[in-house]
Curated annotation (Swiss-Prot):
The lineage of its organism: Bacteria, Pseudomonadati, Pseudomonadota, Gammaproteobacteria, Enterobacterales. Transmembrane segments: none annotated. This is Phenylalanine--tRNA ligase beta subunit. It comes from the Bacteria. It catalyses: tRNA(Phe) + L-phenylalanine + ATP = L-phenylalanyl-tRNA(Phe) + AMP + diphosphate + H(+). InterPro entries: aa-tRNA-synth_II/BPL/LPL (IPR045864), B3/B4_tRNA-bd (IPR005146), DNA-bd_dom_put_sf (IPR009061), Fdx_antiC-bd (IPR005121), Fdx_antiC-bd_sf (IPR036690), NA-bd_OB-fold (IPR012340), Phe-tRNA-ligase_IIc_bsu (IPR045060), Phe-tRNA-ligase_IIc_bsu_bact (IPR004532). Residues 39-148 form the tRNA-binding domain. The gene is pheT. SUPFAM superfamilies: Anticodon-binding domain of PheRS, Class II aaRS and biotin synthetases, Nucleic acid-binding proteins, PheT/TilS domain, Putative DNA-binding domain.
Length: 795
């Protein structure tokens, strides 16, 4: 929101300079983004009148003028502006004047004609805008007056960021209210008097969508002069607020928008068939907008229509066929209150963002429309002439938002602020904010003003009291707290411990958005329906993630595009799965996920550059599971996943319950996502591994351990994990360790089979094992493997 400092000071003028005013606005919660002067630094420019203007004898594009600047004689000035003409009031840079850029005006000869000054354009005075030619001043501009004084150019444009809860400050009225409250000053609003109707012409108005449009005002104004020039004072105020002048009617509605914060619209009465109807769009209804584009309206879009078709998208954008044109004689002024929920997200859906939608989405004052209508009518009649008709006000009292009644307790105020503000100051602040205040036994009861949608609960009032009282007026007090030692269960595995482990193994933590691109997500989870946002930040962030892989794979592509070959990332966060059995139909699961790509290790002269494979990711995952003490209860089962390579993926089971997936990204998906080389991912349900087995103390055997190695031949489809589990089961009393140390395929082993070299570690806690006992245990393992897996000892 941009506004002119001088315009603000017309309403409330605290005795502080510009810098202090800006600081005060910032401390009030309206962050100031920038302050710029409305014009460049210049001197010696005055109002003049062109007395004569003739064509230069030696130049087609130059004119020779005689200009009256209030001196003893007329000045001879050569000008090249196409709009220069006799009788025009202009800005004249006198001899000795210094213009922006340290440009000094001296006597010159242009094609043989003397020039004793310069007729200036806005740009030559450092004034932004799209004006062509020299400045055209009103006929009543006093000759000889300094142009800085006449145009009030000693002014600043202040640009503020208005947070969504302070929609009342999207107009000068709201900003002035805040400044007045902070400085304990009265607010001097321009007088807005009721315009007396001169004609009886009205327009039938029917509101079908009452909940979406609780209030709609319309007024016919006939016989206006649409070609009337917008006054310079209005053009200047619009320019300093960042709006360009279009025509008198549009300028007036924009002026009221900036002044009061109330969007308005004007229709050409001759193009309206019958009357006005406020309704929702019909099936396949289309509308040609002011910019010439055609849109197909969705059924939940509120429209302003006549008895035939839609005229405009309510609160968003007007229709091109019904706007003011050079032939317009009669207009219909529209002023309405639309429910923010009826407007929110609609403009973005059509790729639009307008000043009107920006305000209606956040909420405008539902009591402001009659004043705005009278203000716009008075300006229209004063500038364009015409005869106004009566105002037609269609209001549904039951659908109008009602101001909140809020109880403020003294003890809550003191506790949250940490400082005792006197009772009379609290009452005064709330009253100056526009609240209707009454005292209660516990504190105060306040009825919020109609323009403050954000005042709803007790904490809102406390925030307002602290803001107006002044954060800098609240003394610094050391924080006092009653510390309670947190309960810590030994069985709880801290997520921070797992993160530290992954960092130690070369990973970096990533934080990605919960909003993801639905096109990417459907590639990873084609069989799951995501939660689609009705009002997304952007189209590629319009779905809630079903897993953390979507964001992590995007991070891998981002890094690979920046020449980062070795990528190891992990993330913990929520996934959002539609589930009718869950609260609000969405199940939120805390997940732990990781991704690796590129070489196994950083480049080193003593190591080969080998790419990562399935077992690198599996090893990292097993290191995590080792922390839980449940690694022996974990099973990796070959199982397909649409995003993973069918031969290099596995589901992770804990006590026969699926808790995650691990695998290589499918080659086809790898190409679609623009991944560079083999990429591996894993993901776990954190709550399933957040509990660890509490370590139990066991005696360490004083007796020697014995190792025996066996090599068994089994079919290729036999899982090594099943072999190891069977050995542990058979030798449970004496077998303390089973380890695979070699896998062989080749000569001596039939095709379709593999040789597994396994070490068996045997030990007893009470005695030294005899050779016969060791041999018997090994034989039992071999027999069990032969019976279950048709394994045979390799020669």
């Amino acid at each position: 929101m941009k506004f002119s400092e001088l315009w603000l000071r017309e309403w409330v003028n605290p005795a502080i300079d510009s810098e202090a005013l800006v600081d005060q606005i910032t401390m009030s919660g309206l962050e100031v983004d920038g302050v710029e002067p409305v014009a460049g630094r210049f001197t010696g420019v005055v109002v003049g009148r062109v007395v004569e203007c003739r064509q230069h004898s030696n130049a087609d594009k130059l004119r020779v003028t005689k200009v009256d600047v209030g001196g003893e004689r007329l000045l001879d000035i050569v000008c090249g502006a196409p709009n220069c003409r006799a009788g025009l009031r202009v800005a004249v840079a006198m001899l000795g004047a210094v213009l922006p850029g340290d440009f000094k005006i001296k006597v010159a000869k242009l094609r043989g004609e003397p020039s004793e000054g310069m007729l200036c354009s806005f740009s030559e005075l450092g004034i932004t805008g799209d004006h062509d030619g020299i400045i055209e001043l009103p006929a009543e501009a006093p000759i000889g007056q300094d142009i800085r004084d006449y145009l009030q150019l000693d002014d600043n444009t202040i640009d503020i960021s208005v947070t969504p809860n302070r929609a009342d400050c999207l107009g000068l009225l709201g900003i002035a209210r805040d400044v007045a409250v902070r400085n304990r000053l009265p607010l001097h609003m321009p007088a807005i008097e009721t315009v007396t109707p001169e004609i009886s012409d009205t327009l039938p108005i029917r509101v079908d969508a009452v909940e979406a449009c609780p209030r709609y005002l319309g007024r016919v104004v006939k016989n206006i002069n649409v070609s009337a020039a917008t006054p310079l004072w209005m053009k200047e105020k619009l320019r300093r607020c960042g709006l360009r002048s279009v025509d008198a009617v549009v300028d007036i509605t924009n002026y009221v928008l900036l002044e009061l914060g109330q969007p308005m619209h004007a229709f050409d009465r001759a193009r309206i068939e019958g009357g006005i109807v406020v309704r929702h769009a019909r099936q396949d209804e289309t509308l040609t907008l002011l910019d010439g584009s055609d849109v197909t309206l969705s059924l939940d879009t509120l429209v302003i229509a006549d008895h035939g078709q839609a005229l405009a998208m309510a609160g968003i954008f007007g229709g091109g066929a019904y706007c003011i044109s050079p032939t317009t004689r009669d207009v219909v002024l529209e002023c309405a209150f639309f429910n923010p929920l009826a407007i929110t997200g609609r403009a973005r859906r059509y790729g639009l963002h307008t000043d009107a939608s920006h305000r209606y989405e956040r909420g405008v004052d539902p009591a402001l429309q009659p004043r705005a209508m009278e203000r716009a009518t008075a300006l229209l009649v004063a500038i364009c002439g015409g005869q106004p008709g009566p105002v037609i006000d269609v209001t549904s009292a039951s659908a109008q938002p009602q101001p909140a009644t809020i109880t403020l307790r003294r003890k809550t105020l003191d506790r949250l602020i940490g400082h005792v503000i006197p009772d009379e100051d609290v009452s005064d602040i709330l009253t100056r904010l526009g609240c209707q205040v009454s005292r209660t036994a516990e504190g105060w009861q306040a009825v919020a003003p109609s323009w403050r949608f954000d005042m709803a609960i007790e904490e809102d009032l406390i925030e307002e009291v602290a803001r107006v009282y002044g954060y800098d007026a609240i003394p610094n007090v050391p924080v006092r707290a009653n510390l309670v030692m947190p309960h810590h269960r030994e069985a709880a595995l801290p997520l921070a411990r797992v993160k530290t482990l992954l960092v130690d193994r070369g990973y970096q933590e990533a934080i990605t958005y919960s909003f993801v691109d639905p096109k990417t997500q459907v590639l990873l989870h084609p069989q799951q329906a995501p939660l689609v946002l009705p009002s997304p930040i952007s189209q590629d962030m319009s779905a809630m993630r079903l897993s953390l892989w979507t964001g992590l794979l995007g991070a891998v592509v981002y890094n690979q595009n920046r020449q980062q070959q070795r990528v190891r990332l992990f993330e913990s966060g929520l996934r959002f799965v539609p589930d009718n059995a869950a609260d609000l139909g969405i199940r939120q699961d805390l997940m732990l996920a990781g991704v690796i790509a590129g070489p196994r290790s950083d480049e080193h002269w003593d190591q080969l550059r080998q790419p990562v494979d399935f077992y690198d990711a599996k090893g990292d995952l097993e290191a995590i599971l080792e922390l839980t003490g449940k690694l022996d209860d974990i099973e990796f089962r070959a199982q397909r996943h649409p995003a993973l390579h069918p031969g290099q993926s596995a589901a992770i089971y804990l006590n026969n319950e699926a808790i995650g997936f691990i695998g290589v990204i499918h080659p086809e998906l790898e190409a679609k996502l623009n991944l560079n080389g083999c990429t591996l991912v894993f993901e776990l349900l954190w709550e399933k591994v957040a509990e660890r087995k509490v370590p139990e103390a066991n005696d360490i055997s004083r007796f020697p351990a014995n190792r025996r190695d066996i090599a068994v031949v089994v079919a290729d489809d036999v899982a090594v994990a099943d072999i190891i589990a069977e050995c542990k089961k058979v030798g449970a009393n004496q077998l303390v360790g089973v380890n695979l140390f070699d896998v062989y395929r080749g000569r001596g082993v039939a095709e379709g089979f593999k040789s597994l070299a396994i070490s068996l570690i045997l030990q007893d806690t009470a005695r030294t094992l005899e050779e016969e006992e060791i041999a018997a245990t090994v034989a039992k393992c071999v027999a069990a493997l032969k019976q279950r897996f048709q394994a045979s000892l390799r020669d």
